[in-house]
Amino acid sequence: RYAGTYQEDRLRNDWLLLLGQRRDWAQFAAFLPGYRMGDDHEVRCYALLIDEVEGRADARAADELRRHWYALREADDGCTQAASRFYADGKIRALDVWRKARLAVEANKPRAARNAVEIVAPEALPEARSMFESPSKYLLSFATTRGRLRQELVTLALVRLAASDVDNAARLLDAKWAGQLSPEERNWVWGAIGKQAALRLAPEALDYFANVTRERDLSDDMLAWQVRAALRAGQWKAVRQAIDAMSEDARRDSTWVYWKARALLAGRHVSDAERTQAHQLLESIAGPQGFYEQLALEELGQRVSVPPAPAPLTPEEKAAARANAALQRSLYAIALGLRGEGVREWNYATNLHTPGGMGERELLAAADLACERHVWDRCINTSERTRSVMDYRQRFPMPLQSLVVARSQAIGLDPAYVYGLIRQESRFVLDARSGVGAAGLMQIMPATARWTARKIGLTGFTPDQLADRDTNVTLGTAYLKLVLDSFDGSMLLAAAAYNAGPGRPRNWRNGPVLEGAIWAENVPFSETRDYVKKVLANTTNYAAVLTGQPQSLKARLGQVGPRSDAQAQTNADLP
């Protein structure tokens, strides 16, 4: 009855999971071909398990299993069962299973860690439980490893200890355990210790990483933090080496493409081959669409400009979007207040309903439909999926322009910065509310709003007024201005403070004076790190739209370092 709809595929996804849990492989195999979303790691693991049981798994199946299993942070049934079978059949190694346990321990996921240990060493579960509860006590309870199993448990204990006491983990590894672990285990633990030190912006992080004798033994996440620590220390050779050790998929990320190019160009004597390779890397990502894409553009001597507008949509293209039943159902659900359900159906209709998703012109037409209905988040996200053309009217809309621009200019804020922040905070969804209570266009916390209202003399304020767009913009811009002034006009630091609170970036700025991009890449919180990059890239694009002139992201990033003694701290009581 609902064939081809989001609802049908969502139900099929859940049904496949249930069939897998029941071990009803015949029904699972019958329903799997109609599953369009294909984004459930556990469903894919069940499919790989069936292939292995029936002798159809090819040479690539083990690699795919590892990828899905390692991507799951929480304990699951499908990938655990598949890993158990692949291990029993000799298709994956004991090391592959122990690595899953290490990743789970580092992520503080004890059940997922226990599931992995049970596959490879079920007799070790009681000892593993003791290790997880108190790694320091466990490591002090005996003097030698006495075999491979104990080596792996010591490795897990050191990884877990590093998350809470990095210096103690380093001391114990160096003084007691390093000689009793295999080179691979020792490298992994030093990688975990280095990562935890880098997360704390500790200057000794790079010294810990220097103990690694083979960087390819580390996970991509560890290598990413090795790159960040090396950037912070200005060690460009180490940047290059760590990126080269990453997996092929990781090296394709624009972050590491950019920093590899910078590392190639950073030496005292850059060869012609290095210069050519660096320029090829930069050209492969350069463009206006994102943080590192914009920085690559500037490294090539260009600035960020609004790209040419695509050809106008034809009446037929617009009509086809309006006639799309899934898009209309989505818009209707959003209008009824069922935003989550509506967003999921919209994404399914644009990405998955037809193989390969909608074409470029269809995406522009769907985005146009969302723009017309003022469903700005779907307008932006859909338009961002086009590659050969970019419609900046859709990607960087400016709702409430008279309000936002007037309010920003009245208090000395760059309207492009305000728009860049709103685009990231709420996607212009007026009734947006976060899980922690932030509300409205500028996602203001009630306590922050009350403090700001008192600060600017707004009397009679109550938190329910955050639903009013004028009040929300007034308080949001006022708070942003106070934050910006507190951080001496640094858009980068102010964006970090807006997301993570002012106390954290005050601490994060201490240390060496860094170029803004390096400081941003070293923000310890992944959410805030992603946030500041997007806000500043958004700001640069909005400035290009508002002024019609080429813009520089680098100029907005500036440099970040400790506050000088001559700079007085303003608004020290910022919430």
Stretches with model-predicted labels:
Residues 1, 25-35, 57-71, 94-102, ...:
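Alpha-helical repeat scaffolds
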Residues 18, 50-51, 103, 160, ...:
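Residue-level signature for tetratricopeptide repeat
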Residues 99-103, 153-164, 193-196, 324-348, ...:
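Alpha-helical segment of the N-proximal tetratricopeptide repeat
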Residues 4-13, 22-27, 37-46, 56-63, ...:
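Generic helix N-cap/helix-start motif at coil->alpha-helix transitions
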Residues 303, 310-338, 553:
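Acidic, serine/threonine-rich low-complexity intrinsically disordered linkers/hinges in large eukaryotic
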Residues 175-179, 207-214, 220, 224, ...:
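Catalytic glycan-binding domains that act on GlcNAc-containing polysaccharides
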Residues 18, 22, 52-56, 90, ...:
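Structural motif corresponding to the intra-repeat A-B loop/turn of tetratricopeptide repeats
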